[in-house]
From Swiss-Prot:
Disulfide bonds: none annotated. Residues 252-311 form the SH3 domain. It comes from Aspergillus flavus (strain ATCC 200026 / FGSC A1120 / IAM 13836 / NRRL 3357 / JCM 12722 / SRRC 167). It is found in: Cell membrane. This is High osmolarity signaling protein sho1. The gene is sho1. Keywords: Cell membrane, Membrane, SH3 domain, Stress response, Transmembrane, Transmembrane helix. InterPro entries: SH3-like_dom_sf, SH3_domain, Sho1_SH3. The chain crosses the membrane at residues 36-56, 68-88, 94-114, 127-147.
Amino acid sequence: MVAYSTPSSSLHKPSPYNESRRMARFRPSNILGDPFALATISISILAWVIAFISSIVSAINARGYPTYSWWGVAYSLCIILGMTAVFGTDTGSVYGVAIVGYLSAGMVITTLGVNSLVYRSDSASQAAGAGFILMSMVIVIWIFYFGSTPQASHRGFIDSFALQKEHPGAYGNGRPMSTAFGNRPETTSSQAPQMYTSAQLNGFETSSPVSGYPGGAPGSENRSSSQPRFGNPSNANLTANGNENEVPQPTEYPYRAKAIYSYDANPEDANEISFTKHEILEVSDVSGRWWQARKSNGDTGIAPSNYLILL
């Protein structure tokens, strides 16, 4: 029988969403300090109350009330509670795709409720249909907001009024986050590469080295390689003798970026920096996977681009 040992961390792909593994804390100030969140949630609650009370009155006084509309009332309540949690925990950028999916289903349900109620003769059913119409309008606004990237101009304009969110300097000139996985600045290390025996690899060894990954297989924990991983090393990193030096620190940081997740620097790599969620960093170059950044306290280093959003 094959004995399974504890999986090595080098065999697992690191997740860029470490922040999402911890339950986000609900803060009422995220809603009270955001006019968009406060207004849309308040209007949706008002719309739901109108639809709910009118549905009760219509079901009591009139015959043939469409039972399907009760599912629309229940689903609308779930949407309101879910959106309140999203705004309160400020996790819209994390669950944006799921939010749009649930809102799209709610749009269909409320629209069917409008079609089955607004054309009835009794005033209570018409009032319930009006509540569903108002709820549908709020859902359309939410879909347009969460269905857009954080770099969208209209979303930056809306977020600029919130007290708990950073205000982009020029929301009309928002730039999308770079998806080009270019060269990471190379670092030097005096440590020898870690070697594994056949027993430690436990069947994962190969007869030839992995092509295209000098210095080890992809996912290796040793991130301080003396050989370039992608392409040729920059001439700025080479001395006259051909030896590789530390990455020179830039003097200008023309870009500003906001951290959408917290990041803890690798203790084995002195060139990385740690930062917290919503922290603003100054960035010198945005062309690669790792950006040279500077914090407000003057600390400089490299930061993963998928943790940052350009302002």
